[in-house]
Amino acid sequence: MKTGLIVFAREPLPGAVKTRLAASIGDQAAADQYETMLEDVLKAVRQLDDVAPVVYWACEEGSLPRLSEKYRCRSRRQSWGDLGQRMRVAFEEMFADGTDVCCIIGSDAPDLPLLYIQEAYRLLGALQTDAVFGPSRDGGYYLLGLRQVWP
């Protein structure tokens, strides 16, 4: 079974990330904090067996080679649209590349236990669950896992 992991990220530019945090600590400090979280997330997910994470960047097209090299990761550019549309396109691309099950996480949850991601893959694979959500306290979710994209 080919497992995919999408990490949604933004280029850590001052004024472009963690804007609510930046209001109290400044644009550069917020960008530095975001970059630290991103690096921690990437370091963690590289420990997953048989999973090659792909970072989907919200960035200019010309930034992809530099970001791929700097963060040593497979990189793609996020599509346009709202978050749901961008996630859908990312899943579609991963499944088109032969991925059997795929999860998506954000780049600002460095304390997300790898066990949670592994459990999502177990549910999607062995138990053939169609979709898995990792609910967060704020009413959103920290992980979405799918076996396929539905129309």
Where are these regions (language model features)?
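Conserved donor-nucleotide/metal-binding helix-loop-beta segment in metal-dependent transferases, i.e.
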Residues: 110-140
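Short acidic/His/Gly/Ser-rich catalytic and metal-binding motifs that mark active-site loops
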Residues: 13-19, 63-66, 141-143
